[in-house]
């Protein structure tokens, strides 16, 4: 489905330290700012019971804004044992630098999510698996 347009609701604007759930509730505070806009695709469902996630590259977008963006790639991610892939969206095809930044972000994000899941008593592996 890369190259197709998706509607994404922004839950975490670029530069934000606050990760929110699809309903807007605060999920956690990050020690580092999110380097990308991060949101969800309404009307979809991932294995974790939440809507599919999407990263939107580019300028900072307002919290709660709805944007139509082009899918450029997809990363494979496991969160507390549940398959939780993420769409990567941008106006133009991804450069090598952008791909490395996204991969690096999800490697670090997986470490943080492992800690959060352990504190919350969630079982199962949490890890970044690479590009789909």
Language-model segment annotations:
Residues 1-132:
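Hydrophobic N-terminal alpha-helices or hydrophobic patches in metabolic proteins across all domains
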